[in-house]
Swiss-Prot record:
Keywords: Aminotransferase, Pyridoxal phosphate, Transferase. Its EC number is 2.6.-.-. Its cofactor is pyridoxal 5'-phosphate. Belongs to the class-III pyridoxal-phosphate-dependent aminotransferase family. The keyword Transferase applies. The modification N6-(pyridoxal phosphate)lysine is found at residue 268. CDD domains: OAT_like. This is Uncharacterized aminotransferase YodT. The gene is yodT. PROSITE patterns: AA_TRANSFER_CLASS_3 (PS00600). GO terms for molecular function: pyridoxal phosphate binding; transaminase activity. It comes from the Bacteria. InterPro entries: Aminotrans_3 (IPR005814), Aminotrans_3_PPA_site (IPR049704), PyrdxlP-dep_Trfase (IPR015424), PyrdxlP-dep_Trfase_major (IPR015421), PyrdxlP-dep_Trfase_small (IPR015422).
Amino acid sequence: MSSYLIKPELSSAYPVVSYAKGSYVYDQTGKKYLDGSSGAVTCNIGHGVRDVTEKLKEQLDQVSFAYRSQFTSEPAEQLAALLAQELPGDVNWSFFVNSGSEAIETAMKIAIQYWQEKKQTQKSIFLSRWSSYHGITLGALSLSGFYERRYRFTHLIERYPAISAPHIYRLNHETEEDFVQTAADELDTMIKRIGSQFIAGFVAEPIIGAAGAAITPPPGYYERLSEVCRTHDVLFIADEVMTGLGRTGRMLATEHWDTVPDIAVLGKGLGAGYAPIAAAVVSDSIIETIKQGSGVIMSGHTYSAHPYSAKAALEVLRYVLKHGLIKQSEKKGAVLKKKLDEAASQSGIIGEVRGKGLLLGIEFVADQKTKKVFPPEQAITQLIVSEAKKRGLIVYPSKAGIDSGEGDAVIIAPPFTISDGEMEELISIFSETVAAVEKNLKKD
């Protein structure tokens, strides 16, 4: 049968999904896959949860669409209220969109408009980090320090990445405390060089995702960087698309650093795969400034605050809270990391296991002592992903967080609902996968 669907790799064959339940996905041949990455770190509560799907059927029968400039809806209002209740600090006001990329660009627009309302119209530049990924639309890509995804569009996008990634694994004779100070000084210097009067915000993933396989900053990092932002009147925007809503064992990952952003960007786990939805969640002070000014946020999409998507996110969040899944993410993540560390000790190519909660990254190296990376042509990441999939395990390909774009890594991020037995299965298949790839490398 011919296919006219544009897929990630145009010449590759993909299995056709048949159904999914819990932590497993099944293709049309009947093959079972353990979803070790929750899709794209998305399916936080697993597949086919009837508490959610039954409510969604009811929603479709009640109202399938309402345009946000004509009506509001109960699901959108209730979701916004629940987020305001559960998110830390005064990050209380939700603007719902359809994807993380849209949510990032909404956050950028709101930040710029905030400064316009304060008569500081020159503040329209953003700072971000290298080894970061904030989305594939042009504004989000402008923030992304991810060469592989930037280079084709360099002439169209802004050069916002300016700050080093907090890659502790690759520190050279520097303590974590010294690194935090160096990072704060780097941000401070960059703001001064450009001029704080031109900078609207600093954007960062609390734990780096696709560009860095769960690179996790040391203690004190965001406390210091957010302090630098406040000193220079620069908004701190936390890209929590991958990390938010319990993935790291906290509602927002910035809570690990006792930090509350001015804007939190949510996605992926917000709808948890049941519907496309994302959000820019904004502080009271930003909203109050805009309310006292123009009174209008200049952004929106046809499907913003879609009732069905809002209902999906509402029921997902209710399910997470009802079953204590954020705490489960923290506990299960600690167990899984320990088991991955044990597996790494038996491998000659795993350099580091890192992350928090159920967002874990594994970086592969050619030499564990020197941390030398594999040559790009060896395509270690793809070998690991393909071998794992062949054995019935899905893991998420990632970069290793090196500015040059070199290095190999994968992300393991199963649903919060993964059982102890499923974790054992995950570890077993992953260990076998790494051993098989390593054995083939030795043959070569």
